[in-house]
Design a protein with these regions (language model features):
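Sec/Tat-exported extracytoplasmic proteins
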Residues: 39, 43-50, 66-73, 96, ...
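Active-site-adjacent substrate-binding region
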Residues: 79, 197, 204-310
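Acidic/histidine-rich catalytic neighborhood of metal-dependent amide-processing enzymes
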Residues: 117-225, 246
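Active-site-proximal beta-strand/loop segments in catalytic clefts of secreted hydrolases
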Residues: 42, 76-78, 96-98, 107-111, ...
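Bacterial N-terminal signal peptides
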Residues: 6-17
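Stable alpha-helical elements in mature extracytoplasmic
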Residues: 31-41, 54, 58, 62-65, ...
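A non-catalytic alpha/beta surface segment that caps or lines the substrate-entry region
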Residues: 26, 37-99
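Second-shell loop/turn segments in exported
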Residues: 24-29, 43-56, 80-83, 116-127, ...
């Protein structure tokens, strides 16, 4: 345990001691075909609940694909007590150094919810966010940026009990295990202050994608930048100007720690959520393209805002 904690402190400390990014040539564009293929490959693995062999295979796939893009994945292992017992989990981290060591986290979860009575492959809820992070990391690797970008694939976002709050207890909810662990570990390593913003992608693959503004835990200025960017890019029909509060997602622990967050999630308009129909028939590469393009275009504005804050 002491050795694991020592390694974790080194990992988190290294996140705030990074060399400046080098200028690069022409950067690649976001390719939704690549992102969709990552999504498809993860769906083919099957259900991927935390602690399963299938999720281990998913980690191996992500690590291999990131290595092919010239990026190194670092593992953040931890063990938690859940309603089904002790479960070993692993967050995955890829860092793209910027001119500053202060970080913008770009995150999502890569596990799927445990269902015992039907096959749940989580095409949008799990695979879409994990696939988006892989393609975004590949693309942003080739673009100079002021802040360090840190991509985090969270384990254990999904609840083990059938209903989301069925097994909630005073010590914590039955969900968001990976993000809560990350925040706790960063706090212990005195690394929280270097996180200037946290962007969460969750359920962004639906064919008829509708993203609403979370007003419960998201920072209004982050919502404003992303939605204004989407409008300029003629994607107002996807980034709709309606409220859609989202609690119990991976941005919540960061928001409670005082970090500005945003959650891009199609929760209120995706009837396939947590059903057997969250499959390849209900997701589309075009939705991934819209989110990827808007997010990449929003990042310079987010950085500009952060540089003017005192």
């Amino acid at each position: 345990m002491l050795r694991r904690l020592s390694c974790l402190v080194i990992l988190l400390s290294s996140m705030v001691m990074l060399p400046a990014a080098q200028s690069r040539g022409s950067a690649p564009a976001f390719d939704s075909a690549k992102a969709y293929e990552h999504l498809r490959q993860m769906v083919l693995i099957g259900p991927r609940p935390a602690g399963s062999a299938a999720l281990h295979s998913t980690r191996a796939y992500i690590t291999k694909q990131m290595a092919a893009a010239g990026l190194t994945v670092q593992e953040m292992p931890f063990t938690v007590q859940t309603p089904i017992g002790s479960v070993n989990m692993v967050n995955l981290v890829v860092r793209l150094p910027g001119r500053r060591t202060d970080r913008i986290l770009i995150t999502g979860h890569y596990d799927t919810k445990l269902f015992r009575d039907f096959t749940f492959v989580g095409a949008s809820d799990g695979a879409s966010s994990a696939a988006m992070l892989m393609e975004l990391a590949r693309v942003l690797k080739g673009q100079p940026h002021e802040f360090t970008y840190e991509f985090v694939w969270f384990d254990g976002e999904e609840a083990f009990c059938r209903d989301w709050d069925e097994c909630k207890n005073p010590d914590g909810p039955d969900n968001t295990y990976g993000s809560r662990y990350y925040v706790s570990a960063a706090r212990k390593a005195n690394a929280l202050s270097s996180i200037k913003a946290m962007i969460l992608l969750d359920m962004v693959g639906a064919r008829n994608l509708k993203l609403r503004k979370d007003g419960e835990f998201a920072a209004a200025w982050l919502n404003d930048i992303v939605w204004a960017t989407a409008k300029k890019m003629n994607h107002g029909s996807t980034f709709i100007d309606l409220p859609g509060d989202v609690g119990g997602d991976d941005h919540e622990p960061f928001s409670k720690a005082g970090i500005p967050t945003i959650d891009l999630i199609d929760l209120h308009d995706y009837p396939e959520w947590h059903t057997k129909d969250d499959d390849l028939n209900h997701v589309a590469a075009g939705s991934l393209q819209i989110v990827g393009d808007v997010l990449i275009a929003s990042l310079p504005e987010i950085e500009k805002r952060l540089m003017t804050q005192r």
